[in-house]
């Protein structure tokens, strides 16, 4: 268990540093990260083994939280997975947009991270991303990813 926590912690620290050093690049990274996690991790659970959500919820650290998550997921693990994927995709796309959309995406992903933390010790380091997201909330991102990378763009990834 120590190795996944250590690897997660190093990754999270790198993302936090990126978000503080290059807020726009950090915000774009987080948006892409949530899209990849939605399609990769939750996509594989949802379409490969939706019962894994039940197994995960059954191991929640807090008994009350365990009861709530198991009761919700047990209704339909597959539907839960689809809804989780839809949420993560939506948040990822909001992070890649601009202005108020980014702020909504940041708040949504903060809630998501806080909701994941009580499920397992391995999830606790991910709360560190909230530090980066609070910092990103202070910025107004006036360009979407598309506007940042398209040819003829005046500003690139290096600008906040």
Report each predicted region and the residues it spans.
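Extended, low-polarity transmembrane helix blocks
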Residues: 1-160
